[in-house]
């Protein structure tokens, strides 16, 4: 990890055009160079919002992620590169080695004479988009129940689709040369921090930015960084020792999150004083990067060259 991983632990994705590819599976031999990449993590890896989504609907995987761009670049450099995106929006550290029940989809209705017929109809029409989940899919729960109203000749049933997907590391194996990863943001409540520090006020939906909640959230998240990163370190250790066993030069690249505020003051009322939310959130981001560097150093000591 040392050197390569340290260079690649940066903010953003500009590194795609600046850095050399990692060591391929067959370096400095007469064999063709190849690279097997698996991308794991949360929305920063799945590509939430980048369009061209595929896979389990709630995962919001895009074909335009930074990992996909890197794989395309590596192919252009003559390295035969395969790429799998198994990251999932909303994912957390535990999802790396554990199945995950995705959020329930919005409630809909289906007409049928019985609950068995309703379930069969949903499966036949792929009402839950289970086919899109492909080999990620473990199970589908329709959460079927009979609706109150009756149609003239049949019953109505309400269903709320919920898919359960496999652990992300199920797709990492001895053949994997490189794992790309972002993880930890959802555990630390980054969504709440953004809402409390910069969110608009929407009556009945969002309370808007609040200086006290922002300050307290930043402080609580900062104090939780060491424990959370230690958990992530443990998962990366498992990844290397239990999954990435085929290539002694295989690597894990942990990418830092971008700083979530601009480098200019953004003051919020905080009791009798004010709180600079922008500064607090940027300091939190820098603290997270320092903790990531700490566990990287420790992992490099445990797994030299990985």
Which positions does each model-derived feature cover?
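Short, well-structured alpha-helical segments in soluble
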Residues: 99-175
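Secretory targeting and sorting signals
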Residues: 1-27
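Serine-esterase "nucleophile elbow" of acetyl-processing enzymes
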Residues: 30-107, 111-114, 198-205
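Alpha-helical cap/lid subdomain in secreted, periplasmic
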Residues: 146-306
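Short, well-ordered alpha-helix to beta-strand connector turns
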Residues: 14-15, 34, 80, 175-176
């Amino acid at each position: 990890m040392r050197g390569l991983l340290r260079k690649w632990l940066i903010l953003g994705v500009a590194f795609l055009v600046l850095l050399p590819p990692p060591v391929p599976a067959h370096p400095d031999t007469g064999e063709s160079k190849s690279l097997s990449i698996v991308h794991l993590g949360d929305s920063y890896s799945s590509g939430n919002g980048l369009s061209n989504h595929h896979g389990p609907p709630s995962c919001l995987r895009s074909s335009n992620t930074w990992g996909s761009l890197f794989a395309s670049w590596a192919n252009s450099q003559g390295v035969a590169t395969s790429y799998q995106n198994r990251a999932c929006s909303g994912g957390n550290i535990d999802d790396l080695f554990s199945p995950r029940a995705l959020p329930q989809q919005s409630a809909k209705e289906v007409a049928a004479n019985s609950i068995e017929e309703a379930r069969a109809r949903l499966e036949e029409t792929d009402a839950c988009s289970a086919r899109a989940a492909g080999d990620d899919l473990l199970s589908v729960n329709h959460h079927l129940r009979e609706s109150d109203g009756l149609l003239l000749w049949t019953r109505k049933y309400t269903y709320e689709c919920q898919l359960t997907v496999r652990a992300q590391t199920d797709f990492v194996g001895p053949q994997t040369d490189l794992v790309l990863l972002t993880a930890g943001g959802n555990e630390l409540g980054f969504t709440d921090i953004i809402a409390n520090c910069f969110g608009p006020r929407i009556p009945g939906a969002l309370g808007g930015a609040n200086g006290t909640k922002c300050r307290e959230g930043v402080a609580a998240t900062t104090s939780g960084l060491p424990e959370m990163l230690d958990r992530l370190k443990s998962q990366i250790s498992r990844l290397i020792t239990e999954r990435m066993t085929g290539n002694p030069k295989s690597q894990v690249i942990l990418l830092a999150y971008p700083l979530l505020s601009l480098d200019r003051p953004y003051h919020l009322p905080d009791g009798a004083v004010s709180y600079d939310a922008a500064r607090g959130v940027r300091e939190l981001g820098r603290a997270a990067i320092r903790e990531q560097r700490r566990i990287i150093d420790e992992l490099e000591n445990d797994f030299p060259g990985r």
